[in-house]
């Protein structure tokens, strides 16, 4: 009996201290639902569709509110104005990344995506410098993309118009493009090592998009229990092994005066700073940075184009207009180039609408404040997690009337010219916007226009029967599996 009394008193004290602490915190943080001990507000959040849950809470608490995903507060930014004020106007104060997600834990504070402070500044600055020197954003990188697209077109022709899943081939293009930048060589599509790497990469994305991954981020203790996160950790180990083998080959042939790719540049930087014990340029940082570049340069492009093909099957009238514009601007025999995009407003609008509509990353990995922040009259302590709902911006019904409808007109003016929108935040915003945005834009345009120049897309079912809803709606909106026929024209 005494034990039960003791436990009852202990639990009562715990609840009192928890609620008192939350009350104190609520005096500083934005408003939000009252959290329960330990579980916080997780029972009010659908981990299969977090953005929808946040939208419902925003209707009650406003565009800036606080939720507890577990025992720690997260400030949520909902809508364009709140996101712009935080991530752009006060970008320096909201520029760190949290370390609770599955991917951030395996990065160990290194690389380009999940590092913070001086590590992030130096690694990102160096990586951008190297990428630019290797032709990123210039004709040089466009030539690499064009070369890889030829391999893709050849592989599509070999399907002979029979039904096929386009996932692998669409992923090969951006993966091989970034491979030439990092490793100085591409992989044959039949290379088993390459296929294993691609399968490994795709499986990691599926795990990251799963509800279990979201729960692990809220309750890190789950990382120590059985679950699919252990499969993720094995895949990360295999990926590191693959990358280290490439690095070892580079070390044997390295010419300090003539770097050929990203690894060479990084190894030379390591050599220059080998006597600096505080150098950010280490072997571990190189491995993680390469993984980050593959992530930034592959998944967004391949999934967006794949989802785009599904939407073009669903809306054949849109496909016909793109092909009409291709015929008018480019013709049948000249290859599309990036210069053509300025003369193809409808195609450009469709590409933007695909990204807006699919909302591939509805809520990017949370950031955290770099210092105590005064924001909209609230006090947000240093290290507080901050979540930006991109869905709320991409689906703003004032900027995009009928946002639930796929309509390229969202990015066209009354004269049919392409219309830019500040609300287009498919690559996030501020200092932590996707480093691969420029490359992804080039690849999407060139892949899609080349496919539609050379093939007619034939669905296996009637367009009205095609379901475009994502199969997963957690961290990522993953397109449903589908097949189609590529009929040569």
Swiss-Prot record:
* Residues binding heme: 434
Task: List its EC numbers.
Answer: 1.14.14.-
Q: Organism's domain of life? A: Eukaryota
Q: Name one GO cellular component term.
A: endoplasmic reticulum membrane
Q: Which InterPro entries match?
A: Cyt_P450, Cyt_P450_CS, Cyt_P450_E_grp-I, Cyt_P450_sf, Cytochrome_P450_fam2
Q: Name one Pfam family in it.
A: p450
Found, by tissue, as follows: Expressed in liver.
Q: Which family does it belong to?
A: Belongs to the cytochrome P450 family.
PANTHER family xrefs: CYTOCHROME P450 2C70 (PTHR24300:SF200), CYTOCHROME P450 508A4-RELATED (PTHR24300)
What name does UniProt use for this protein? Cytochrome P450 2C70
* UniProt organism field: Mus musculus
């Amino acid at each position: 009996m005494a034990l039960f009394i003791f436990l009852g008193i202990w639990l009562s004290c715990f609840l009192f201290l928890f609620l008192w602490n939350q009350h104190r915190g609520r005096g500083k943080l934005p408003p939000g639902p009252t959290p329960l001990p330990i579980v916080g507000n997780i029972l009010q959040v659908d981990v299969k569709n977090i953005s929808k849950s946040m939208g419902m809470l925003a209707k009650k608490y406003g565009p800036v509110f606080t939720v507890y995903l577990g025992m720690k507060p997260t400030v949520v930014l909902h809508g364009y104005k709140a996101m712009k004020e935080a991530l752009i106007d006060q970008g320096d104060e909201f520029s760190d990344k949290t370390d609770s997600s599955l991917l951030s834990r395996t990065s160990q504070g290194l690389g380009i995506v999940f590092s913070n402070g001086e590590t992030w500044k130096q690694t990102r600055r160096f990586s951008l410098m190297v990428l630019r020197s290797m032709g990123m954003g210039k004709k040089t990188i466009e030539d690499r993309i064009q070369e890889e697209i030829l391999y893709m077109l050849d592989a599509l022709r070999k399907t002979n118009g029979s039904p096929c899943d386009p996932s692998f081939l669409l992923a090969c293009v951006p993966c091989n493009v970034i491979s030439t930048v990092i490793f100085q060589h591409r992989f044959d599509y039949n290379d088993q090592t390459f296929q294993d790497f691609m399968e490994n990469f795709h499986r990691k994305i599926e795990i990251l998009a799963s509800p279990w991954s979201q729960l692990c981020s809220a309750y890190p203790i789950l990382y120590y229990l059985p679950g699919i996160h252990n499969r993720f950790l094995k895949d990360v180990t295999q990926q590191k092994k693959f990358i280290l083998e490439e690095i070892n080959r580079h070390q044997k042939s390295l010419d300090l005066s003539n770097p050929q790719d990203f690894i060479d540049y990084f190894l030379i930087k390591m050599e220059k700073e080998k006597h600096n014990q505080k150098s950010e340029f280490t072997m571990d940082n190189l491995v993680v940075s390469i993984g980050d570049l593959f992530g930034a340069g592959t998944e967004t492009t391949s999934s967006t184009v794949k989802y785009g093909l599904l939407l073009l099957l669903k809306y054949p009238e849109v496909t016909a207009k793109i092909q009409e514009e291709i015929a008018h601007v480019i013709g049948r025999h000249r290859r599309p180039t990036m210069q053509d995009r300025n003369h193809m407003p409808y195609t450009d609008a469709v590409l933007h609408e695909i990204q807006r509509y699919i909302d591939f990353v509805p809520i990017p990995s949370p950031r955290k404040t770099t210092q105590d922040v005064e924001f909209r009259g609230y006090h947000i302590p240093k290290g507080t997690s901050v979540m930006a709902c991109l869905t709320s911006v991409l689906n703003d019904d004032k900027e995009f009337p009928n946002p639930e409808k796929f309509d390229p007109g969202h990015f066209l003016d009354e004269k049919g010219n392409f219309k830019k929108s500040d609300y287009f935040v498919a690559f996030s915003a501020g200092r932590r916007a996707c480093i691969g945005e420029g490359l992804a834009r080039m690849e999407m345009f060139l892949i899609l226009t080349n496919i539609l120049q050379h093939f007619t897309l034939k669905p296996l079912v009637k367009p009205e029967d095609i379901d475009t809803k994502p199969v997963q709606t957690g961290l990522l909106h993953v397109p449903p599996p589908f097949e189609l026929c590529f009929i040569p024209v």
